Amino acid sequence: MLLAVDVGNSNISIALFDREGSLRFRASLDTDRRKTADQICVDLMNLFQLYHFRYQEVSDSILCSVVPPLNFMMEKALTRLLGKPPMVVGPGVKTGLNIRLAVQTQMGADIVADAVAALEIFQAPIITIDMGTATTIGVISEGRTYEGG
């Protein structure tokens, strides 16, 4: 199973997918920059218990974050809980997405994940809408090119 974690400014969205890609559960936690890795582990363990799944059955995890102060603790918590580090969406991760922005590092990992997911489901051109703490509209043109938002 795959555990997907999206750390936003207001909430942390957590989803568990089985090997066929079906959603098994989706949950949300408050984003709290003060939490330690141990506290995050307890929160995740409680979610697995709440939804009647075993975290020991998770084979992989992926982390997407727009809250840099939480990145280290979240990575540490996922590594401790699952026994191996998560894939972290960020600079250097090969997505097959061409980004046409002057400063690509200003593009949030959540927006990259949105665009890649949209391209897995639909053919370009595509308009994406991310409704996190801030609402962001993006445009993906032919050739898997993110034009901006």
Predicted stretch roles:
Residues 76, 81-87, 93, 97-149:
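Phosphate-binding/catalytic loop of phosphoryl-transfer enzymes
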Residues 55-66, 85-87:
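Short glycine-rich phosphate-binding loop at a beta-alpha junction
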Residues 2-46, 144-149:
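Short glycine-rich, Thr/Ser-proximal phosphate-binding strand/loop in the N-terminal lobe
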Residues 14, 63, 132:
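Residue-level signal for inorganic ion chemistry
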Residues 2-6, 62, 126-130:
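Short glycine-aspartate micro-motif
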Residues 44-60:
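Phosphate/pyrophosphate-binding loops at sites that engage ATP/ADP/AMP, CoA/4′-phosphopantetheine
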Residues 13, 72-73:
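Phosphate- and divalent-cation-binding pockets in alpha/beta enzyme and binding domains
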Residues 7-9, 67, 133:
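A generic beta-sheet turn/junction motif
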